[in-house]
Design a protein with these regions (language model features):
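A conserved beta-strand element that flanks and buttresses the S-adenosyl-L-methionine
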Residues: 153
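Hydrophobic adenine-recognition pocket in adenosine-nucleotide-binding enzymes
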Residues: 157
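Class I (Rossmann-like) S-adenosyl-L-methionine-dependent methyltransferase catalytic domain
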Residues: 2-145, 161-172, 182-260
């Protein structure tokens, strides 16, 4: 379970769009997850493999993420610490190496494919000593340690979770945050509805569906930003940053939400 990009024509996207994930899933949940695991076991443990053949966009992706994330790190209202981060769907550690380790003291990785985590130990080089945990686990089963993380980074992996499991996972992530901790989701979004990908056994949700699921998990999206300069054939990739709902007043932290 790791980061990837989907390519599909706009016409095909609309033709295969569903109104909710359950309409797209023909097989049961066990098959949905097992097919994804088998798919990733056949993917080479390289940056190009992690990005579905789009290794050339890695630097663009990382630079955009770093510019985005640094707005929320440090001291002050609405900001979080730089102690420990969690990389979800980490693969070989592409994001850990170039984004998270340069910004945080320690990082944990979680991925469903053991071969990717084994590769990460060498891919990360000397900086691997600042990785405290390599968890081999599907996110539908993963339980973050309570109050451990300043940032939980979830990129190009939520499509491998059913709606219910995504909500449950985000709730568990919420309990894994330190005070003022943040959850970042960076992923493809469909133009409309929910679009299945039979190749890697995943789905792509539109932004309104994603927002609804985040809300169900008891999180407020406090900021959104669109990743720029990706190839046109790739889905839009917004970055959303969320924090736990602390009261029922509907008030948020003061960060601007940018509609994408």
């Amino acid at each position: 379970m790791t980061d990837c990009n989907k390519r599909q024509s706009a016409r095909a996207r609309k033709q295969r769009s569903c109104t909710k994930m359950e309409d797209c899933l023909i097989e049961d949940q066990t098959t949905f997850y097992s097919k994804a695991e088998l798919y990733w076991k056949e993917v080479p443990p390289t940056v190009d493999g992690m990005l579905g053949g789009y290794g050339s966009i890695s630097s663009i992706d990382i630079n955009g993420s770093k510019k985005f994330l640094q707005k929320f790190l440090g001291e002050g209202e609405g900001k979080t610490g730089m102690g420990c981060a969690l990389d979800c769907g980490a693969g070989i550690g592409r994001i850990t190496k170039r984004l998270l380790l340069p910004l945080f003291r320690t990082v944990d990785l979680v991925d469903v494919t053991q071969e990717f985590l084994d590769k990460a130990r060498t891919y990360l080089g000397d900086e691997a000593k600042r990785v405290e945990n390599y968890f081999c686990c599907g996110l539908q089963d993963f339980q973050p340690q309570p109050e451990r993380y300043d940032v939980i980074w979830i990129q190009w992996v939520i499509g491998h979770l059913t709606d219910d499991h995504l909500v449950e996972f985000l709730r568990r992530c919420r309990s894994g945050l330190r005070p003022n901790g943040l959850i970042v989701v960076k992923d493809n979004v469909a133009y409309e509805g929910v679009i299945p990908d039979d190749v890697d056994s995943s789905v792509c949700r539109d932004l309104n569906v994603l927002r609804r699921l985040v809300d169900q998990a008891g999180l407020n999206i406090i900021y959104e930003e669109q990743q720029q300069n990706f190839p046109e054939e790739i889905y839009q990739v917004p970055v959303t940053i969320s924090k736990a709902v602390e009261n029922n007043s509907g008030e948020e932290s003061g960060w601007t939400i940018i509609e994408v």
